[in-house]
Amino acid sequence: KSSAASDVYKRQLEAGDYPIYAGTDVRSCEQIGVHTEPELRVTERLASRADCAPKEAFDRLVAATDEQGKTEKAYESVPLSTVSRREEIEKNLPEAPDFTGDKGIKLEDVANNRATLAGFAAQLEDIELEALCRGDYVMNSKLGTPGNAAVYGGILESLREKGVPPVTATDGPSGIRLHSYASLLPIGTLLASTWNQQLVRELYSVEGAEMARKGSDVLLAPGMNIHRDPLCGRNFEYFSEDPLLAGTMGAAVVRGIQSQGVSACPKHFACNNQETMRIYNDSRVSERALREIYLKGFEICVKTAHPFNIMTSYLSLIHI
């Protein structure tokens, strides 16, 4: 259970008994134990995100009790956001370093501790900073391995002169998509059905080695969105409707790929639960649903496997 105060979001376990079941499926499981919480226990305190609240008023369905004690449906007005997201973002923007012009600092100087990243970045023109944020516009970029899904990093000659390489990214969760033959991997839903993290890690370790041979720096995988609706066109890439299973399987994929010196890229962060017309969608989600369902798998993966890249979703999330 979770509760949100004005500025604190708490994850907590209510007092009581928690039965534990085991089995091959939900129809053939049996109780094997029980966990008892003697009193309410707060497991985590987090800063509440008031800007997750809706901007426009509407009524939501809630359970109520009539005079006879029977449950009936009722409606209540949703609490509205009182926070300016623009002000929050602007308040937390880091201070930009003063532009120095080219000082001859290469990216490898930063890697070898001969210069700081801030000093390297202070050399960059606005067009170079923009290029680093954007990447190349096209799939199958001429700057990368033929058949690539994207290239980013050193897409300008001036960046490459400073030692920033063009990074080749390829689809996807079921194998490398390039203009060459590559291994075909089982889909994410099937992998999650094994419940075998070690097997998944070993599979993607082999995949990482194949990436290195074929010139793929980043595999746009694992797909980690929640199976919210059976009609979602990307469900085959995703693991589960359960964020714990999705998070642990995603972490196994990341560890396997990155054990070979290349990068994984969990996607689509977050709430990409409809593929059709996805760039026009706006997912309206409560803070609790975000924290406990749609972000939880990503949280597990990031904290335990440390992916080098993450791909955002294509939709708007609560108006952004």
Residue ranges and their predicted role:
Residues C29-G33:
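Extracellular and select intracellular beta-sandwich modules with Ser/Thr-enriched
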Residues K1-D7, Q12-S28, T43-H319:
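Glycoside hydrolase catalytic-domain context in secreted enzymes
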Residues V34-T43:
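Short beta-strand edge segments in extracellular beta-sheet folds
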